[in-house]
Amino acid sequence: MKSVVNDTDGIVRVAESVIPEIKHQDEVRVKIASSGLCGSDLPRIFKNGAHYYPITLGHEFSGYIDAVGSGVDDLHPGDAVACVPLLPCFTCPECLKGFYSQCAKYDFIGSRRDGGFAEYIVVKRKNVFALPTDMPIEDGAFIEPITVGLHAFHLAQGCENKNVIIIGAGTIGLLAIQCAVALGAKSVTAIDISSEKLALAKSFGAMQTFNSSEMSAPQMQSVLRELILPT
């Protein structure tokens, strides 16, 4: 199979390697269809920021089940799936409390081990979930980044009937805007320094947008105060 391999000092190459085999009964092999490039990948590519080299990055990806281990009976070849890249230890105090993202001994697909910039990958069954049959497979690669905004809404006890302000209309912000609208926000406001991104924010459901590079700090404070304080 082909994979994108990163060496040190920003060197990127396409390499041929053996298709990985399933070694444990709780594993599945995924034929990757779509894999996103995260902002966190950039220092790993250009600033020697990965844990080791050479490495295949990619932690936002979707694809189709290609093979399953003997202990997997709820997924079958051809099923569309997305990947959850976090690999907690499940035994440390934080994991036992359910705070898997705080695991002291976590592993991570596409960062601490080879990831989704390849044609195939073998992962644990618990690290993939089936996608709706009517979802375009490319959309599945957005599942991991969309959870960033959803996590914030979860910490805020939801956003239904609330005034939601998204600061930064990059990929994560634009996904959060769509989530806020879908979850019943009273209003959704986007703030950025890029007019192009703010236009995208409007197209994705933001009810009002502000370019903070064109406003003074007192003006921005006044806008935020009006948005946050009840009338």
Enumerate the language-model features and the residues they cover:
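NAD(P)H dinucleotide-binding glycine-rich loop of Rossmann-like/cofactor-binding domains
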Residues: C89-I167, M215
